[in-house]
UniProtKB/Swiss-Prot annotation:
Any single GO BP term: photorespiration
UniProt function note: Accessory subunit of the mitochondrial membrane respiratory chain NADH dehydrogenase (Complex I), that is believed not to be involved in catalysis. Complex I functions in the transfer of electrons from NADH to the respiratory chain. The immediate electron acceptor for the enzyme is believed to be ubiquinone.
Annotated compartments: Mitochondrion inner membrane
Membrane topology: Single-pass membrane protein
GO cellular component: endoplasmic reticulum; mitochondrial inner membrane; mitochondrial membrane; mitochondrion; respiratory chain complex I
Disulfide bonds, paired cysteine numbers: none
Keyword Flavoprotein: no
Similarity section: Belongs to the complex I NDUFA13 subunit family.
TM segment ranges: 43-65
Key words, A-Z: Electron transport, Membrane, Mitochondrion, Mitochondrion inner membrane, Respiratory chain, Transmembrane, Transmembrane helix, Transport
Protein name as it appears in the record: NADH dehydrogenase [ubiquinone] 1 alpha subcomplex subunit 13-B
Main localization (coarse): mitochondrion
Pfam families: GRIM-19
Originating organism: Arabidopsis thaliana
Amino acid sequence: MTEAMIRKKPGMASVKDMPLLQDGPPPGGFAPVRYARRISNTGPSAMAIFLTVSGAFAWGMYQVGQGNKIRRALKEEKYAARRAILPILQAEEDERFVSEWKKYLEYEADVMKDVPGWKVGENVYNSGRWMPPATGELRPDVW
């Protein structure tokens, strides 16, 4: 199909038949283009920025110091509470150990009753130095 049939107008025979429309500059020409670097002369000065940042940093460090004081006080309170109850816990552990040690000595006496010359509770290593007893055997609830 030709343009004449679609648009109901006669088509162009040549490009030369086209109307001459061309874009151009406006009358008087275009405004000059500014291509130089644009440095703003508004806004805070370098000194104002420096002082603001320094103040914010100083305030932040002050807050860190206050947090350290609070954390140190809480830690000291926790340690003081532990130091306060430590003698009670140690007394309970000593009492438990003595009762378990008595049971252990009774068991040892029962097991070794047929061995001549066996002394119940005597150290078998005879190193001459005092060593704390191996409490692993006396703590079946832990192991």
